[in-house]
Amino acid sequence: SDFKRFAKYYDPEVFVEAGRIIRQRAQSYDDLEYTERAEKIAELFGTFKNPDKETVLTPWRVVNLQLSKTIGGLRYFDENFENTTLNGQDSITWVETEITKEVFKPNTKILEINSKTGLYPLYVASSLFHQKRNKLNDDRAGRFSKIDEDEIIQEVLKENIYI
């Protein structure tokens, strides 16, 4: 069988170590601001290869292209979806489409039924976070803390995103 033929190349120690390295990288993002953290997580997933012919891990660039052109939200790429920076600055931009206000309303409920990497719900969650943080910024004239931001992301994950 094919499995027996390839089993000799499987080294459990390498597999375990690779998993440990990935977890360490992901944990190193914990102290970043949420928008930057989302971008770093997406970059990490970009290092993964499609595991087989039937499974396609949609790249972050494609997730941004599809969602920003349909529902709008927080786009992490330039207008051509080629770069995440422009003149040394993040290309992060809020995009409005015909349905953006309907999709990204405060009480919206987003159900992701086919999540493999979680990049689609990550895009939506970071967009909702961005909106709510901007509202908090306006309401408090810029006076809010990391604790306030933590509460926003927890609210988004609890009230708006379902996987």
Regions found by a protein language model. Name each.
Residues S1-I163:
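Class I S-adenosyl-L-methionine
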